[in-house]
């Protein structure tokens, strides 16, 4: 039992007074104060951690993993997850932390926008730059140069060596009349229409698209003015392409193209055979590099020693200058030419002059 204070009055009357209890409000205030301090401390800690996290993220986003890093080929396969992509980049040491990269991607809401493909990435790039490249699909482009004068077979081999599919598939497409019709080429094959130039393609570019781009380039070069010139000369576009392909194969020195073109135009006007060795060679399966008298006597749709006029079609893919020469030949009376074995030719107006040139430059007499 506890003691309680007693009040004694003058008349001797005593009254017991209860001891006052602790103030409830004071207790509540104390607890609230403690909670406030705890929450404040927690908020300060969270704020500090947030600031630290934001600083770390900002530093990660804008800092390359290695300023001296060299470019690496990174292949993002279709359907690859964000986790897989970030781990691949971290494994290749393109980025320092895969988790932070995933946070960056998700924060930017770009997880579904990363495009598959072959990329040239480097640790000298910032994660932000890397993400931009992946989202924009700025994949590596591989170049392939098609020289003037290659035929379909040679072009197909070049495409295969460059890693853009097989030679067979390329030839199947290029020789498909239906595909040629789709491309609005009025010919059975695309021989002559795969324009010689340097092209840039993604590694996974289908051959169909490669061929389409080559034909589109031909259509750009063969301008409306050239089409009108073709009509003025009385030729079809296919005939001009055929003639240009012969000029391309006969030319060793580019300055001679218009003169060589004039020889063929002059012979066509006179009803003479073109007598062009490259046309004979084109018509010989598995030509071994040595043209023989038998070859010259063998009748094929391409042997211009045996047939009059142009061969059955182009024998190669001519470049712009050969097409231009076919449309705008030099004005000459030449009917013959023979190689001087130095990339140039000796041009002649008569068979007598030509035979003399042959003896001098070919027979050494």
Predicted features by range, described:
Residues 23-68:
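N-terminal type II signal-anchor transmembrane helix
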Residues 81, 145, 158-171, 179-365:
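Bacterial extracytoplasmic/cell-wall-associated proteins, especially those involved in peptidoglycan
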Residues 8, 14-17, 62, 275, ...:
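A generic signature of intrinsically disordered, low-complexity regions enriched in glycine/proline
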Residues 42-47, 73, 143, 228, ...:
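N-terminal hydrophobic or amphipathic segments with adjacent small-residue motifs
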């Amino acid at each position: 039992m506890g003691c309680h204070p007693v009040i004694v009055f003058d008349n001797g009357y005593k009254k017991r007074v209860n001891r006052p209890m602790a103030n409830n409000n004071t207790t509540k205030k104390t607890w609230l104060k403690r909670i406030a301090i705890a929450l404040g401390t927690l908020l300060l800690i969270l704020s500090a951690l947030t600031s630290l996290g934001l600083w770390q993220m900002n530093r990660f986003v804008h800092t390359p993993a290695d300023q001296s890093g060299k470019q690496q080929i990174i292949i993002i396969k279709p359907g690859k997850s964000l986790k897989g992509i970030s781990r691949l980049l971290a494994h290749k040491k393109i980025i320092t932390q895969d988790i932070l990269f995933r946070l960056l991607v998700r924060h930017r809401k770009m997880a579904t926008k990363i495009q598959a493909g072959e990329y040239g990435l480097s640790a000298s790039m910032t994660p932000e730059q890397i993400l931009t490249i992946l989202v924009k699909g700025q994949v590596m482009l591989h170049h392939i140069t098609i020289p003037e004068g290659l035929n379909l077979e040679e072009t197909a081999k070049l495409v295969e060596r460059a890693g853009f599919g097989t030679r067979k598939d390329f030839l199947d497409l290029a020789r498909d009349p239906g595909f040629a019709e789709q491309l609005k080429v009025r010919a059975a094959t695309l021989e002559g229409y795969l324009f010689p130039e340097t092209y840039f393609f993604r590694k996974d570019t289908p051959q169909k698209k490669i061929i389409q781009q080559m034909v589109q380039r031909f259509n750009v070069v063969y301008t409306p003015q050239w089409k009108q010139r073709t009509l003025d000369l009385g030729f079809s576009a296919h005939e001009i392409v055929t003639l240009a392909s012969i000029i391309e194969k006969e030319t060793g020195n580019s300055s001679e193209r218009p003169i060589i073109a004039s020889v063929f135009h002059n012979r066509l006007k006179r009803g003479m055979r073109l007598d062009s060795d490259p046309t004979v060679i084109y018509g010989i399966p598995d030509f071994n590099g040595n043209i023989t008298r038998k070859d010259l006597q063998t009748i094929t749709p391409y042997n211009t020693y045996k047939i009059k006029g142009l061969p059955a079609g182009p024998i190669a893919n001519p470049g712009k200058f050969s097409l231009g020469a076919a449309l705008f030949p030099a004005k000459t009376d030449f009917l013959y030419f023979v190689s001087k074995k130095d990339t140039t030719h000796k041009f002649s107006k008569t068979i007598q002059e030509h035979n003399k040139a042959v003896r001098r430059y070919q027979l050494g007499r």
